């Protein structure tokens, strides 16, 4: 068995080379068909090493609690910014780029492989103001050096799932990328 697998892999590799040769030969005769563009920028702050990934554990939340209260209390998390240079930017706006919940616009949808259904994850300021995903937040004033921006994340039941008692229990996760815009 091992010998057959090895021979098949070698002959497949050889066929791959044969198919690539005509493509390579034609691309040698082409003129300037690949261009690279970009911009090198200086950011006002950096995210310290080890702080790039923010993981938040909600623990166990009962569907009965969500049927009664619609949402959980916020769980605090922090964005750490370091080496802030105010000559580059004195303010920062945050955008959480993520898949938006259809049942709760502005909140993060759960990942497709989540067992739980009928819920979404919301983000809010310490003053309880919603920070909708895919929208720019309010401005945060920066200080020279280190800055910490604190926010809350919460779980909320989708209205239809609450009315029809269709929140499904199970593990869940959601992911967002953070975009920082300095002014």
Enumerate the language-model features and the residues they cover.
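Bacterial N-terminal signal peptides
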Residues: 13-24
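Mature extracellular/passenger domains of Gram-negative fimbrial/pilin and adhesin proteins
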Residues: 2-9, 24-183
């Amino acid at each position: 068995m091992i010998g057959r697998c090895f021979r098949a892999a070698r002959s497949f590799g050889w066929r791959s080379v044969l198919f690539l040769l005509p493509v390579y030969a034609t691309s040698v005769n082409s003129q300037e068909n690949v261009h690279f563009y970009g911009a090198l920028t200086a950011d006002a702050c950096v995210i310290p090493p080890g702080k790039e990934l923010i993981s938040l554990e909600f623990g166990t939340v009962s569907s009965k609690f969500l049927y009664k209260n619609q949402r959980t209390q916020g769980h605090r998390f922090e964005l750490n910014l370091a080496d802030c240079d105010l000559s580059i930017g004195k303010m920062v706006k945050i955008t959480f780029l993520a898949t938006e919940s259809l049942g709760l616009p502005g909140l993060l949808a759960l990942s497709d492989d989540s067992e739980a259904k009928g819920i979404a994850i919301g983000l809010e300021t310490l003053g309880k103001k919603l920070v909708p995903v895919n929208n720019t937040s309010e401005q945060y004033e920066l200080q020279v050096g280190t800055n910490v921006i604190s926010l809350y994340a919460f779980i909320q039941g989708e209205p239809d799932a609450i009315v029809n008692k269709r929140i499904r229990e199970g593990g869940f996760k959601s992911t967002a990328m953070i975009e920082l815009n300095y002014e």
